């Protein structure tokens, strides 16, 4: 499979998950791995690129069960991009 096509599909999958709610990194990786077998570093690398493109943001939230967690949230631009990807 073409590498750019793969990246586009993975970007779509991550944005689709984030469109339903905010996720912290480990939780997102775990849920994605239920349908796709991905290396954990792949998900984090794509999240970083999505942040750089302003398609999602990262924020820190305190946890009742341990240390603070980094959460990811889709932006308005990310929602528009997701709609475009779904139409292709």
Which residues make up each language-model segment?
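A generic structural signal for short beta-strands and their flanking turns/coil linkers
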Residues: 8-11, 52, 68-70
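N-terminal helix-turn-helix DNA-binding core of bacterial DNA-binding proteins
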Residues: 2-44, 61
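Alpha-helical DNA-recognition elements
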Residues: 45, 49
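Basic, amphipathic "hinge/linker" alpha-helix immediately C-terminal to the N-terminal HTH DNA-binding motif
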Residues: 63-86
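Short, charged/polar surface micro-motifs in flexible loops or helix N-caps
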Residues: 20-23, 52-53, 77-79
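A short, conserved structural fragment
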Residues: 51-59
């Amino acid at each position: 499979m073409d590498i750019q096509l793969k990246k586009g599909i993975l970007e779509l999958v991550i944005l689709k998950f984030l469109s339903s709610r905010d996720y912290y990194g480990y939780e997102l990786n775990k849920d994605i791995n239920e349908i796709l077998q991905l290396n954990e570093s792949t998900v984090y690398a794509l999240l970083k690129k999505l942040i750089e493109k302003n398609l999602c943001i990262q924020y820190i939230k305190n946890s009742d069960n341990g240390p603070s967690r980094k959460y990811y949230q889709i932006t308005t631009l990310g929602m528009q991009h997701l709609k475009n990807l779904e139409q292709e």
